[in-house]
């Protein structure tokens, strides 16, 4: 399985690469008045208007001191959605058995498990569950 590893406020997360359409540098965001608090706004990506979500709010992580540098565009149920992250680190090929299941409460049901990879632990998230919550 391939995963895209990214950082949010010094924590490392991963999503399955099959869900990732593209990785882009930060671009101009158009704010949407009276939208849900987790919606950062809209971006125009090669003529396509895409909703941009604040992954910090979805993951319930405080905004870090770093500027969010990247946008990950995800393909979810025939819809493209973007999430802003501090930094995209790498794309890794991992064996399924490296993913350790973790007990989580229903509130954190979007966590698929943790990847104990070399000298670090990366949280693998089910991005569809996270966005639907």
Q: In which residue ranges do the predicted regions lie?
A:
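An acidic, low-aromatic, low-complexity terminal/linker signal
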Residues: 1-133
């Amino acid at each position: 399985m391939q995963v895209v590893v990214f950082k949010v406020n010094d924590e490392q997360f991963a999503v399955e690469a099959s869900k990732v359409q593209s990785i882009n540098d930060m671009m101009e965001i158009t704010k949407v008045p009276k939208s849900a608090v987790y919606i950062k706004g809209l971006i125009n990506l090669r003529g396509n208007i895409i909703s941009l979500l604040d992954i910090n709010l979805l993951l319930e992580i405080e905004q870090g001191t770093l500027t969010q540098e990247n946008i990950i565009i995800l393909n979810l149920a025939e819809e493209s959605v973007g999430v802003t992250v501090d930094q995209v680190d790498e794309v890794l090929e991992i064996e399924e058995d490296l993913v350790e299941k973790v007990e989580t409460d229903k509130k954190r049901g979007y966590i698929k498990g943790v990847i104990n990879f070399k000298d670090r632990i990366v949280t693998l998230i089910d991005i569809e569950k996270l966005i639907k919550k």
